[in-house]
UniProtKB/Swiss-Prot annotation:
This is ATP-binding protein SyrD. Keywords: Antibiotic biosynthesis, ATP-binding, Cell inner membrane, Cell membrane, Membrane, Nucleotide-binding, Transmembrane, Transmembrane helix. ATP-driven efflux pump necessary for the secretion of syringomycin. May specifically bind syringomycin and translocate it to the periplasmic space. SyrD is also required for full expression of the syrB gene. SUPFAM superfamilies: ABC transporter transmembrane region (SSF90123), P-loop containing nucleoside triphosphate hydrolases (SSF52540). Its main location: membrane. It is found in: Cell inner membrane. GO terms for cellular component: plasma membrane. Residues 343-566 form the ABC transporter domain. It comes from the Bacteria. InterPro entries: AAA+_ATPase, ABC1_TM_dom, ABC1_TM_sf, ABC_transporter-like_ATP-bd, ABC_transporter-like_CS, Cyc_pep_transpt_SyrD/YojI, P-loop_NTPase, Type_1_exporter. One of its GO terms (molecular function) is peptide transmembrane transporter activity. GO terms for biological process: antibiotic biosynthetic process; peptide transport.
Length: 566
């Protein structure tokens, strides 16, 4: 079952993005570009008139200075003013893309892999920004070029015909080389995504790399070095194609000037004044033409960025409104959190593909009901589906078949966000945020309460509360980071706690404290607790033990009360 987020969006148009976001500023850019174009060509005409004047004319000097100033001011205005608009547009798109990622189903993000998603933010958005910044310049130079062509037509149709013919030939040759370079533009982007994956491994696998020389040498040579060489090679070949394409422009200019000087007189009688004006105009408009030609790779890269973003379901031309929240909805949600009775998985199936390999995993059919206040252990061998089941249960993974029910009502796309708010979780691949988050967005947890939890979990000497954050989240052992993650979960104070092999990295005394003191305390406070664990010596403390094998529940056992009290 495909979700809404998985649908591919239309790539969109960068020019339409600029117009829809700031129509008046875009119109102003076009208008000033036209004025700059007219003034620039008028300067060429004044120069030509001055060349053929027999005596110095003060009026020509005034026209030359005045028109040059007008052309310069309007060209700069048309280029600089939209930079502010571009900045605002890109800020909005960055925020919207982050919200899009937050709203994308977790299984879709996992399927794509973190490096691919990060490349959207670190490569595609900056590339789109660079393209957007060059758009005003393209508009201005296009205006200058078009007025230059019109001026040539005004001077002589023969000159105009020769110019257009050679330019069409030059553009055709340019596109031939340009398309060759575009093949490598795609390769550069794909290889950069792979390089992002290696840099991620470099940072987070540094300990393993330092400990093993064979792995370190393999990683340095076969991974980082080879990927870097491929990025450089594809960049170089791409640059060769694009440079060859740009050189076509210089060749076209030389041919064009030669044809005007030596071939045009064969077809028509052209006086010296018209010929000099034509050559001056051609030389003048070649600057904008070369700039437009040079901008094509940037435009192409921006188009690729739009396509990659659209593949993720993010179109730059679609509205991206801020999420709306209602105080009344929050009150109803909080009331419901206090009174929920059961959560049911009904004939749930979930097919999951490992993003790191081609292997897949199937969960289901799963039929399971969890009641409020239960302490449930989820057990089974590695790879049996415990973590996948947990993510389905808390609403992070959307079942491809079957239903997730809260008090008999199906959890839908509209209610899934509220449903997830029932949970505080510490997964095996958890991430610590340096911010105190309480149960209510309007009320921050007290620092005294946070300090009490730090003391309870033996972190009072390692972590201090500073403002609304922690003094550190990184200068801790992995086991201590897990304890701090549990402190965060305590402060959230949600009805359901989901802990994925939390005790696996704790020392025996603290592991015992966790099972015999912390979990019973949470249960006494009315919390529902789901524990993924391998610690069979504490199984007797659970209300229920659910065992999984090959993605299916093979047993669901209720533990005797007497056994737990013994």
């Amino acid at each position: 079952m495909k979700t809404k987020q998985e649908k591919k969006a239309r790539p969109g148009s960068i020019m339409r993005l600029l117009w829809s976001s700031h129509p008046w500023l875009t119109f102003f850019t076009l208008l000033t570009g036209l004025i700059s174009g007219v003034a620039s060509i008028a300067v060429v005409n004044v120069i030509n008139q001055a060349i053929h004047e027999e005596t110095f004319q003060r009026q020509s000097l005034f026209w030359f200075v005045g028109l040059s100033v007008v052309a310069l001011l309007f060209r700069n205005g048309a280029s600089l003013f939209p930079a502010y608009a571009s900045m605002r547009i890109m800020t909005r798109l960055r925020i919207a893309l982050c919200r899009k990622i937050l709203g994308t189903p977790l299984e879709e993000v996992d399927r794509r892999g973190a490096p691919n998603v990060l490349t959207l933010l670190t490569s595609d958005i900056p590339q789109l920004n660079a393209t957007l910044l060059i758009m005003p310049t393209i508009l201005v130079e296009s205006a200058v070029f078009l007025f230059g062509i019109a001026y040539l037509a005004y001077l002589s149709w023969v000159v105009f015909a020769i110019t257009i013919s050679l330019m069409i030939l030059g553009v055709a040759m340019y596109l031939l080389f340009f398309m060759g370079g575009m093949k490598f533009t795609h390769k550069v982007r794909d290889e950069f995504t792979a390089f992002n994956e290696y840099t991620h491994a470099l940072v987070f696998g540094l300990k393993e790399l330092k400990l093993n020389g064979i792995r370190r040498r393999w990683f340095s040579r076969s991974a980082i070095q080879e990927s870097s060489v491929r990025v450089a090679k594809y960049n170089y070949i791409e640059r060769l194609w694009f440079t060859a394409a740009e050189n076509v422009g210089q060749l076209t200019l030389s041919l064009l000037v030669g044809c005007l000087l030596f071939a045009a007189p064969m077809f028509a009688v052209i006086d010296a004044k018209t010929m000099s004006a034509s050559v001056l105009a051609v030389l003048y408009i070649m600057g904008p033409l070369v700039m437009l030609v040079s901008a094509m790779p940037m435009l192409a890269q921006g188009r690729i960025a739009c396509t990659r973003l659209a593949d993720f379901g993010f179109s730059i031309n679609e509205p991206h409104p801020e999420p709306e929240t209602s105080d009344a909805d929050n009150v109803l949600l909080l009331d419901h959190k206090k009174s929920w009775g059961s959560i049911q998985l009904k004939n749930v199936h979930m097919n999951y593909k490992d993003p790191q390999s081609s292997s897949g995993f199937a969960l289901g059919p799963i039929d399971l009901t969890i009641h409020s206040g239960e302490l449930v252990y989820i057990v089974g061998g590695n790879g049996c589906g415990k973590s996948t089941l947990a993510k389905v249960f808390c609403g992070l993974y959307i079942p491809q078949e079957g239903q997730l029910l809260l008090d008999g009502a199906a959890v839908t796309d509209d209610s899934r966000g509220d449903y997830r708010d029932l949970f505080s979780a510490v997964f095996s691949d958890f991430h610590l945020f340096n911010r105190l988050i309480g149960p209510d967005e309007k009320e921050h947890p007290s620092t005294d309460q946070a300090q009490t939890y730090l003391s309870t979990l033996g972190l009072e000497d390692k972590v201090k509360i500073e403002g609304l954050g922690y003094s550190t989240t990184t200068a801790l052992s992995y086991g201590q980071q897990k304890r701090l993650a549990l402190v965060c979960a305590y402060l959230e104070d949600r009805p359901i706690y989901l802990l994925d092999e939390w005790a696996a990295d704790q020392d025996p005394p603290f592991k015992r404290f966790f099972y015999e003191e912390l979990l019973p305390d949470l249960k006494r406070r009315g919390k529902t607790i789901l524990i993924i664990t391998h610690d069979d010596q504490y199984f007797q403390l659970a209300d229920r033990i659910i065992k999984l094998a090959d993605g299916c529940i093979v047993s669901d056992v209720k533990c005797a009360v007497e056994g737990k009290r013994a």
